[in-house]
Amino acid sequence: MILYPAIDLKDGQCVRLLRGEMEAATVFGDDPAAQAAAFEAAGCEWLHLVDLNGAFAGHPVNGAAVEAILARLTVPAQLGGGIRDMKTIALWLEKGLARVILGTVAVENPALVREAARAFPGRVAVGIDARKGRVATKGWATETDVMATDLARSFEDAGVAALIYTDIDRDGAMAGPNIEATDALARAVSIPVIASGGVSSLADLVALRDTGRIAGAISGRALYDGALDLAEALRTLRA
C-alpha cells in the first residue's frame, strides 16, 4: 500500500481543513515546495496535492505553488481541485503532473472523465468525496443524491487509474479513517482505491493495509502535527 503525503494549498500556503470547511483552515507552512522536498527526502513514493481555492472556484488558482512543487520533485505527484475541462487536464499533465484527479466533473460530466482517461491512459483518477455515503462536489460545498459506490461502479470500464475516496466527516478530524466504507468500495470495484480522510496514526495505516484491498492512503494533518512519522510509516508499509 502506498502512502501519499498531502499538501493542501490555500492562498499559496500549506493548510489543512477540518471536514472541508475553508474557514477552519490551519496554516502549516508558507513554502509548499520546501514541504514537498521534505516529504520526498523522507522517502515518499508519491505526493498528493490539492488546490483548495481551485476546488471552490472551478478552475486552477494555486498554479504557481503547484509548479514550484513540481520543479523540486523527482517523485510523481497527483493533483485535484478545479480541474474540470480537457484543456486544464492536458496543461497540468504537460507541466509534469503524473496524474490528475477529477471530482466534480465525475458527477456533472462523466463523459469528460472517459474522454480524459482515453486520451491520457493511467494518468486520470476519480475523486469521490462522500458524506454519509453520498457524494459532495464543488469543494464539498454541494451535496448530491449520488451514492459513492454507484459513482465508482459507473467508471468500472472507463480506464481510470484510481479512485480516491474521501470520507468528509473524517477529513482533518484525526478521528481515524472510515475503514469499513473504504473497504466496501474497494470490494465493489476492480479499480484501485486510495483512502483519504482521518488517517491519524500508524495503526490506522496498518489497518487499511491489512484489508488487503486498499491500494493507498493519503495523510496530511497527522504528518504536520507529528502524530504520524513519515519515515517510520513508510518503513512499516514496506516491511
From Swiss-Prot:
Keywords: Amino-acid biosynthesis, Cytoplasm, Histidine biosynthesis, Isomerase
Entry's family note: Belongs to the HisA/HisF family.
Membrane-crossing residue ranges in chain numbering: none
Name under which the protein is recorded: 1-(5-phosphoribosyl)-5-[(5-phosphoribosylamino)methylideneamino] imidazole-4-carboxamide isomerase
Main location: cytoplasm
Underlying gene: hisA
Taxonomic lineage of the native organism: Bacteria, Pseudomonadati, Pseudomonadota, Alphaproteobacteria, Rhodobacterales
One Gene Ontology term from the biological process aspect of the record: L-histidine biosynthetic process
KW Amino-acid biosynthesis (keyword) present: yes
Organism this protein belongs to: Cereibacter sphaeroides (strain ATCC 17025 / ATH 2.4.3) (Rhodobacter sphaeroides)
Coiled coil location: none
Associated pathway: Amino-acid biosynthesis; L-histidine biosynthesis; L-histidine from 5-phospho-alpha-D-ribose 1-diphosphate: step 4/9
